[in-house]
Regions:
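Gly-rich Lys/Arg/Thr-decorated short loops/hinges at beta-loop-alpha junctions or inter-strand turns
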Residues: 34-44, 117-118, 174-181, 359-366
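Active-site nucleophile and cofactor-binding loops and adjacent substrate-binding regions
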Residues: 23, 45, 70-75, 95-98, ...
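Phosphate/pyrophosphate-binding loops at sites that engage ATP/ADP/AMP, CoA/4′-phosphopantetheine
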Residues: 54-69, 142-149, 166, 195-205, ...
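N-terminal phosphate-binding loop and adjacent alpha-helix
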Residues: 29-67
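Gly/Ser/Thr-rich active-site cleft segment
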Residues: 9-11, 118-237, 300, 304, ...
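Glycine/Thr-rich phosphate-binding loops that ligate phosphate moieties of nucleotide
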Residues: 1-30, 37, 69-112, 146, ...
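A polyampholytic, Gly/Pro-enriched intrinsically disordered region
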Residues: 111-127, 228-233, 251-253, 439-453
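ATP-dependent carbohydrate kinase catalytic cores
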Residues: 178-288, 292, 298-302, 315-322, ...
Length: 487
């Protein structure tokens, strides 16, 4: 039997999974690593620790001595790394997608009326979230970086490119269309790096990787006496779209990981949002480029980690389930989880997190429930924005670590007033990487074949009388007040 390898490089951990041809998990390993918070709004990663987490999870998979015929890489998007073209040595820590240090730069470009130009070409808004302003910051703030870049001696990559570079021994500098589409430098209409965007952000073209389809031949890597072709690379949220088999226009998924990302397949042409959502590339498989609309929420699992590590409300994330109210009642307590600003559809980089409505009677359960509801309320805002853009939502497929919490899934269904579909394996990004690589290698004949294969799903249906419209209205008023305070 042939086997597929998925390298799933996430914001706080790396996971490697071996699948058989029917996409059953054969073996997996996971390794966490720390993020670095040098200043308010700054989030970094040590490139060496990130790379070490990949090898620590990859080597046990290779040690199985199975016939792994291809590998796929999926990765946290937008996180920005710059390294020496000859030695591979990073010039500084990686700047993580959550980092907001370039807010002033983005605001200055908005003042020059450049946001509409950027949005028309990239489908993205002007926000520190995306890679371009992060590259500019590195070139302008790391000593000697700009001169080295202009001399052709530096390379930029999102995490996929960085991993491919190192796995290939520094011989391959490529990315795929999904990761390129998150940089604010890639024109999603022409499928090329855009000269005007490079000029706006002052980034030399020589730094950038070659852009390929998601199921391209990305070369191979040799490790532990094995040579494995890499036939798939795809950003993690797009990989979850593939993993959930969202191959038809209108298919939609939401991934609840470090952040939360709702994505709907919008077909073969880009659809511009009028409601604060992003137009992006969903995937390019078997030649066809499928586009997507996306709503990005910056904090999801991060909220639970903060309640655990900083507030010490519980010892492990699973214990948060015990403190989550079954009915979603938080006794007037509200929470805005803007640790690094707020994402779609509001896009405010300055606002910060806050609780509201705390009294002497407020309990840990009230605060934990308010925190979970703050995520659900953001999902409702994105659902409403999608409907304003003409997307008719009948149900929602979900995945990611948080959806193993049955109480959360039930409340999500109650408040969204939708059926929630949870797959048996909630790690859709890893499955998507395996599917992408399998298509690239020729193991799967068609996307529809994969979609029609039976999958076990758990379905949560909304209960009557749980959603509190007044509580949602108060939460929205509180968010608007905070955005005014931090204006």
């Amino acid at each position: 039997m042939s086997y597929l390898l998925a390298i799933d490089q996430g914001t706080t951990s790396t996971r490697c999974v071996v699948y058989d041809e029917e996409l059953n998990i054969v073996h997996s390993a996971q390794q966490a690593y720390p993020l670095i918070y040098p200043e308010d709004g700054w989030v970094e990663v040590n490139p060496s620790e990130l790379l070490a987490s990949v090898y620590q999870t990859l080597d046990p998979m290779l040690d199985l001595s199975l016939e792994i015929v291809c590998a796929g890489i999926t990765n946290q998007r937008e996180t920005t790394l710059v390294w020496d073209a000859h030695s591979g040595e990073p010039v500084c820590n990686g700047i993580v997608w959550q980092d907001r240090r370039t807010a002033a730069h983005c605001n200055a470009l908005k003042d020059q009326s450049l946001e509409s130009v950027i949005q028309a070409k990239t489908g993205l808004l002007l926000d520190p979230y995306f890679s371009a302003s992060k590259i500019s910051w590195i070139l302008n703030n790391v000593e000697g970086a700009r001169a080295r870049a202009e001399a052709g001696n530096l390379r930029f990559g999102t995490v996929d490119s960085f991993l491919l570079w190192h796995l290939s021994g520094g011989t391959i500098h490529k990315t795929d269309v999904t990761n390129a589409s998150r940089t604010s430098l890639f024109n999603i209409n022409t499928l090329q790096w855009d000269g005007e965007l490079l000029e706006i952000f002052d980034v030399p073209l020589s730094m950038l990787p070659e852009v390929c389809s998601s199921d391209a031949d990305f070369g191979s890597f040799c490790r532990m006496n094995q040579t494995i072709p890499i036939t798939g690379m795809i950003g993690d949220q797009q990989s979850a779209l593939v993993g959930q088999r969202c191959f038809d226009s209108g298919d939609m998924k939401a991934t609840f990981g470090t952040g939360c990302f709702l994505m709907v397949n919008s077909g073969l042409t880009p659809q511009s949002s009028q409601s604060g959502l992003l137009s992006t590339i969903g995937y390019q498989l078997s030649g066809d480029v499928h586009y997507a609309l996306e709503g990005s929420i910056f904090s999801a699992g991060t909220i639970i980690q903060w309640l655990r590590d900083n507030m010490q409300f519980f010892q492990d994330s699973k214990s948060s389930i015990e403190l989550l109210s079954h009915s979603g009642q938080s006794n007037g307590t509200l929470f805005i989880p803007a640790f690094t600003g707020i994402g779609a559809p509001h896009w405010n980089a300055e606002v910060r997190a806050a609780f509201y409505g705390i009294t002497r009677d407020t309990s840990q359960q009230d605060m934990v429930t308010a925190a979970f509801k703050s995520l659900i309320y953001q999902v409702i805002d994105i659902k409403d924005a999608l409907q304003e853009d003409g997307i008719n939502i009948q149900s929602l497929a979900v995945d990611g670590g948080m959806v193993t919490n049955e109480k959360f899934c039930q409340l999500l269904s109650d408040f969204l007033e939708l059926d929630i579909h949870v797959p048996a394996s909630t790690e859709s990004s890893a499955i998507g990487a395996a599917i992408t690589a399998g298509i690239g290698h020729g193991l799967f004949s068609s996307k529809q074949e994969l979609k029609q294969a039976s999958r076990h799903l758990t379905v949560y249906s909304p209960r009557d009388g749980i959603r509190d419209a007044r509580d949602l209205e108060r939460w929205r008023e509180f968010l608007q007040l905070l955005m005014q305070i931090y204006k």
